Amino acid sequence: MAFLASGPYLTHQQKVLRLYKRALRHLESWCVQRDKYRYFACLMRARFEEHKNEKDMAKATQLLKEAEEEFWYRQHPQPYIFPDSPGGTSYERYDCYKVPEWCLDDWHPSEKAMYPDYFAKREKWKKLRRESWEREVKQLQEETPPGGPLTEALPPARKEGDLPPLWWYIVTRPRERPM
């Protein structure tokens, strides 16, 4: 049961939400007609909502375990996997053709003039990122435990009154200074 590999690091709420999403995705594979899918999805939502406010964690954990076992027995043998998702037919297929963003810096001014709004906004973001990069890295280093992150959750948002975080697409890359 590979889907439980990160189980100890997730909260109960995260486990329930992931189970619900997996169940809906498998239900989508069973019910290809949209109206039938919607009907059974509403029934499933009602089953989850029935125990939403459960205060007893022992009972809630037992319910989650039973729900995961039921999901295991009722899952689709060949669930639909989106082509660009991991395990899909086109996963990472076209990454070699994607042009990195820094290539836009080499555009000729006449080419940039065709998209003035985009390049004006892009220059503002680049300037903002250059100005706040050191603070971003410092904040991430302060909030990351010495042994590395203990969960797969992303770091929290910035402190109140500060700029929004700019690391949403850099979070999986090494922390080098941006261009």
Curated annotation (Swiss-Prot):
A GO-annotated cellular component: mitochondrial inner membrane
Membrane topology field: Peripheral membrane protein
Main location: mitochondrion
Keyword match Glycosyltransferase: no
Record carries keyword Ion transport: no
Positions where N-acetylalanine occurs in the chain: A2
UniProt subcellular location: Mitochondrion inner membrane
Keywords: Acetylation, Electron transport, Membrane, Mitochondrion, Mitochondrion inner membrane, Phosphoprotein, Respiratory chain, Transport
One BP annotation, GO: mitochondrial electron transport, NADH to ubiquinone
Annotated InterPro entries: Complex1_LYR_dom (IPR008011), Complex1_LYR_NDUFB9_LYRM3 (IPR045292), NDUFB9 (IPR033034)
Modified residues (Phosphoserine): S85
Region span, Disordered: 136-162
A Pfam family annotated for this UniProt entry: Complex1_LYR
Subunit structure, interactors included: Mammalian complex I is composed of 45 different subunits.
Protein's job: Accessory subunit of the mitochondrial membrane respiratory chain NADH dehydrogenase (Complex I), that is believed to be not involved in catalysis. Complex I functions in the transfer of electrons from NADH to the respiratory chain. The immediate electron acceptor for the enzyme is believed to be ubiquinone.
Family, similarity comment: Belongs to the complex I LYR family.
UniProt xrefs under PANTHER family: NADH DEHYDROGENASE [UBIQUINONE] 1 BETA SUBCOMPLEX SUBUNIT 9 (PTHR12868:SF1), NADH-UBIQUINONE OXIDOREDUCTASE B22 SUBUNIT (PTHR12868)
Protein name in the entry: NADH dehydrogenase [ubiquinone] 1 beta subcomplex subunit 9
Organism: Pan troglodytes (Chimpanzee)
Gene transcribed to yield this protein: NDUFB9
